Every structure is written in C-alpha cells, then in structure tokens.
C-alpha cells in the first residue's frame, strides 16, 4: 500500500527531514531560534524519538524524555508537516508515545512543554495547563506547560 502509515524509531539519517519539517512550521508554530535547539536535541539529548511516515514521505516526528528521577515522562518536539495537520496524525503519534511511556512503571505523570500556538491540541488530548511563562522559547513564543490528566 502506498499510503501506509508507519511510526518507527528515529535514525540519524532522518535529521535533515526532521529539520525540513521544522522549517515548514516556522514561524507558524516554532521560532526560528528553535532550530539550533532541535539540532542539539537530536545530536545530544534524544532518549526516545519517532518518525511518522505516510508511504515514503516523512510527515511528522516526536519523542519523549524523562525527568532525572524517571518519574515524569516529557513529551518533546512534536512536529507535523502542515499539509498533514488536522488529519488525526498528530493524535496517533502522541498516543503512540503515551503508550510507550506507560511501559515505564516508575512514571507517575506525563507533561508537555508547548506554546500558545499548539496548546489547544494537547487540551483536546487530555492535557491541562499548569504554567505559562511569557517569551520563554523566544519573543512572542510563550511556554505552556501542561500535565496529562488521563494517567495512569
């Protein structure tokens, strides 16, 4: 099938495709300054990161990390190609990661750190806003910290 949806683990050879996804979402969802943060994450901080493919096209990516004590799962770097937003693919990718986090029995909560531009998506997925920090990511890009309410 040409339009088979696959979620697989990130490989270093995916880096350019992921950066291209970020650029397609800049400045609509991300600040231009965040590209260097993503590069650093992909090269140094990655714990679990996934690529969403539709057929042969990379249409999304996202991962998760843990707090130092391993009791909090942290959803990280959700990026979806603009042409594939609002088609449930972001929900599929998020749910995949939440199910993966459930495999870690020490996790007591799941959070996401997003912006005012994307927090409504997470609200619809069961996250509740717990903190706002203005201009956190860059001027005009505020931090919206949210906790998952459907845990465990």
Identify what each model region corresponds to.
Residues 66-76, 85, 104, 140-142:
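A conserved beta-turn-beta hairpin within the catalytic core of GNAT-like acetyltransferases
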Residues 1-33, 53, 58:
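Short amphipathic alpha-helix that is part of the acyltransferase structural core
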Residues 11, 67, 81, 113-115:
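Residue-level recognition of the GNAT/N-acetyltransferase active site
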Residues 51, 57-66, 72-79:
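Conserved beta-strand in the GNAT
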Residues 47-51, 61, 77, 111, ...:
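Short hydrophobic/aromatic beta-strand element in the GNAT-like acyltransferase core
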Residues 80, 86-99:
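Conserved acetyl-CoA-binding loop-helix of GNAT-fold acetyltransferases
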Residues 109-113, 123, 128-145:
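Conserved catalytic-core motifs of GNAT/GCN5-like acyltransferases
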Residues 28-51, 63:
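Active-site rim helix/loop that mediates acceptor-substrate recognition in acyltransferases
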């Amino acid at each position: 099938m040409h339009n088979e949806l696959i979620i697989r683990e990130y490989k270093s050879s995916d880096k350019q495709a992921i950066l291209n996804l970020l650029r397609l979402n800049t400045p609509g969802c991300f600040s231009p300054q965040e590209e260097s943060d993503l590069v650093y994450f992909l090269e140094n901080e990655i714990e679990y990161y996934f690529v969403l493919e539709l057929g042969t096209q990379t249409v999304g990516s996202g991962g998760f990390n843990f707090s130092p004590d391993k009791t909090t799962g942290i959803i990280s770097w959700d990026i979806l190609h603009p042409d594939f937003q609002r088609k449930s693919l972001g929900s599929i990718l998020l749910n995949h990661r939440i199910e993966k986090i459930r495999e870690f029995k020490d996790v007591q909560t799941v959070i996401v750190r997003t912006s005012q531009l994307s927090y409504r998506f997470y609200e619809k997925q069961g996250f509740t806003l717990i903190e706002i920090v203005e201009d956190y990511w860059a001027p005009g890009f505020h931090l919206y910290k949210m906790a998952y309410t459907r845990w465990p």
